[in-house]
Amino acid sequence: MTKAVLTSISQLALKALLYEVSLSPKPGLVDRFDNGAHDDMSFMTFIDSMIALSPFFQAYIETGFAYAKEEPLLLFNRLRQLGQKAEETMFCATQGINTHKGLNFSMALLLGATGAYLARTPHLMTDLGCFSKEDTLAICRLVKPMTAHLIQTDLGHLNTKKEFTYGEQLFVTYGIKGPRGEASEGFTTLTDHALPYFRQMISQNDPETSQLRLLVYLMSIVEDGNLIHRGGIEAWKGVKADMRLLLQQDLSTTDLRLALSSYNQCLINQHLSPGGAADLLALTFYFAFLEKLL
């Protein structure tokens, strides 16, 4: 019974990744229509990556459930070790292409926290149908003590390094904390912005329109390390401003799709891809499935 419930939730995480890549059109991003601003990956690359990561999603939630009483830092270390193995498996499946590195990190923490939370709330194990937005908030809050050390430990001593990872370079150059920062704050962009917005949208619109509007909203607010890495601060600010204007127009679904298709070509021409917004889109979908919004 327990394993079946945990398996079903891990499959929601996989489903969230599938929904994210399948949503189309997504400016600058890989979707069903084209590869966006990416010349090294395609829709099929993402499928390969998801299949590789799927067993680890199961392992993350089972680890959280099994070690729910453990100190948060110890649970984090277990999840990180699993996450590193997952990352290696992903890179093997994609022939070295980074499709989901940041999202895998976030999913490891949130699935681990989901498992730990379920171990403490046995009524949900027998009736996931009563999962609420309060449960979502509680799960995200569990991540905070697990990752409170992360910025100092991972990014606090970079002055001694000669070579940086992509995320480290963003922190050194711009002070962007990326997924580490989001996690260490308890995923507040998710709980305070993305999910409330999506709950409102889905109550007023069909699922596809709601998902597209959510993407635009996220592109208008997210501190997107991928955009900044590719185009700098001004390019990122420009995308945010463009998306704010698009939101204000309150377009029909047909016109919104046309606008996003046009903007896709604009970002392709600038080699810009809002990968940070895409990751938060997938995380929003995960909790939307748990809350039965989708």
From Swiss-Prot:
Its EC number is 2.4.2.52. It holds the Pfam family CitG. It catalyses: 3'-dephospho-CoA + ATP = 2'-(5''-triphospho-alpha-D-ribosyl)-3'-dephospho-CoA + adenine. GO terms for biological process: prosthetic group biosynthetic process. PANTHER family: 2-(5''-TRIPHOSPHORIBOSYL)-3'-DEPHOSPHOCOENZYME-A SYNTHASE (PTHR30201:SF2), TRIPHOSPHORIBOSYL-DEPHOSPHO-COA SYNTHASE (PTHR30201). Belongs to the CitG/MdcB family. This is Probable 2-(5''-triphosphoribosyl)-3'-dephosphocoenzyme-A synthase. The gene is citG.
